[in-house]
Amino acid sequence: MAAPRVFPLSCAVQQYAWGKMGYNSEVARLLASSDPLAQIAEDKPYAELWMGTHPRGDAKIFDNGISQKTLGQWIAENQDSLGSKVKDTFNGNLPFLFKVLSVETPLSIQAHPNKELAEKLHLQAPQHYPDANHKPEMAIALTPFQGLCGFRPVEEIVTFLKKVPEFQFLIGDEAATHLKQTMSHDSQAVASALQSCFSHLMKSEKKVVAEQLNLLVKRISQQVAAGNNMEDIFGELLLQLHQQYPGDIGCFAIYFLNLLNLKPGEAMFLEANVPHAYLKGDCVECMACSDNTVRAGLTPKFIDVPTLCEMLSYTPSSSKDRLFLPTRSQEDPYLSIYDPPVPDFAIMKMEVPGSVTEYKVLALDSASILLVVQGTVIASTPTTQTPIPLQRGGVLFIGANESVSLKLTEPKDLLIFRACCLL
């Protein structure tokens, strides 16, 4: 009998401190639904579910017909399951890590280097940059999701410089004036002025940052107490960030970066060198396999200011332009494809109404990982002997060129995400 090429996975949960607690976390709810033996602790954070072969969370295989115990081991011995192009392009490795994130408190403001810079940084400082790969990533909201992403239009930054004197103080009059003067100039002049302003902020002395932040927090708190609305300078968000990261330079970044409020199904794509931070909510995320992160604030960890200021993409764009839109499949009315401009990964979203009794997941020339977010199905393939029951939180590995038939076992809508590589 041929070895199975479609099988369920048991995936790693990461309990980082910023995660949502207990059953407030979508990660915990998915885990509890898919594993009846899972013990969810209400006083512990459930931050990330990892679906892939990353050494710090290689998915486990419990199929008795498979001798390998993890997905990484299995792929190493079943290279053709990746798909011929994927295998050759990515040296026999699964090129992506698929995740669910449940964010309670903001993650650090960060950017990820492109391939060329990653190789250089890894060579120079492997203790901070553990590999030589780039790390593009994409987040698709499962619940209302808030994040910072990319530099705002210059007009908006200039407005904040006028309305927030503490922000202007840290940037300095010269850099701020220069930015105002370049508003009507070409993109290169704008980028240069923006880099100068951001670098001034990032290179400010900690003591001065803390003083200015305290002044701003005091001013906003007094205005809010007096019943005034401070949302024109994101008063509530600033107070919240300061409470979580007192004195942190990242609190001022909200005046530089777009604030995105994603509705379920909306996405943002974070290409190399784009500053970003996840603030709160639940999402599915897919990324290239890398741990390289250059931090900019909202963190107690190492901040490499010179590298950060040098590498960032200083191209302003509106928050609307930062949304990444899926394309609807022509052949399948229930399928949307989020296909970013990188070779490492794509995400497919399948929303199947409960009135449908059977749904076919089409074969791809790529290994893929499928996550059930809503609904209950029984999966079968032409090559599997035993059908595989999957419910909410269930994760299925699908080898290249394998199709899967999903039988809906109850008349409830089905929501599935599938990470793959569309070369």
Curated annotation (Swiss-Prot):
Its EC number is 5.3.1.8. It catalyses: D-mannose 6-phosphate = D-fructose 6-phosphate. One of its GO terms (molecular function) is mannose-6-phosphate isomerase activity. Its cofactor is Zn(2+). Its main location: cytoplasm. Pfam families: PMI_typeI_C, PMI_typeI_cat, PMI_typeI_hel. Zn(2+) binds at residues 110, 112, 137, 276. Pathway: Nucleotide-sugar biosynthesis; GDP-alpha-D-mannose biosynthesis; alpha-D-mannose 1-phosphate from D-fructose 6-phosphate: step 1/2. PANTHER family: MANNOSE-6-PHOSPHATE ISOMERASE. NCBIfam families: manA. Isomerase that catalyzes the interconversion of fructose-6-P and mannose-6-P and has a critical role in the supply of D-mannose derivatives required for many eukaryotic glycosylation reactions. This is Mannose-6-phosphate isomerase. It comes from Macaca fascicularis (Crab-eating macaque). The gene is MPI.
